């Protein structure tokens, strides 16, 4: 509204990464025109987000602090890219967004716009004028825009890869989120098995129902897992600007998919494949979180992650229960546990007893040498 009053021809754009229903998108459009936009568009980048980043996050089992599936932070960059692309298409002179000066999103948006839309002015009225929510509400009311502006205790960001929750008890380090803070609640109490089938690291079936559309597969798993209240947690981490941040989230699909995928990899990858993939995946997740998706090293990491998935095919089985789940097993033609060389702790067929003793003696050589020279350092 303020920009239109200042003489700008405002083109409002909503970049959707799977977090809006049709009703919400329609309401966005109506509100945009009520606030003075000359044009409104929805830019659906959900599938682009999956193809260009989300599938690599699954390949890498990316969890920030072994906890948070970087739901919002990974989506923001694709929202920003979509907005920058649209701004170029219409020849925009400026891009405006509503970030404050207190969080990570201002960095993700501004950096992307600076790189993807060079020369285009970036307008951030909320940040520049240090506006409070109440000041924004007062301004809208004064200019005839009436709506329910009741301040929510929590703020939510919803996307295909989970929902983040901020505010309320999260501002007190000694408190956790109450049940009413979550958008989805437990409706299933009976245990059930969930089968997730992968082909080279990508989901192809859920409970033996085939899915060509990976987004629909994720949504199906979310529907199943959310009914058990699975995927709730709270992450405390370091923000890009250097302060600690605390965010609650509910992410049933990410938690179930990543743990199912990780389980399948335990059976189908070598020790060193798993080790090195974990190292580069941690870097990948950190770079996504810290607004470095456009860094030239990212495609190199993606190539390594893709290569690592060539044998990650099969079905992982999980047992779901209210507020939790456990891994059961896998069914895969690439199951390395099926080796005919031996059964762990039971019987071996690939070596003799004397060969085993020789292997152990050779393996111990470096330690025998060291402690032979430094007997006083024995532990």
Can you describe what each PLM-predicted range is?
Residues 1-379:
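Nucleotide-activated chemistry modules centered on ATP-dependent adenylation/adenylyltransferase
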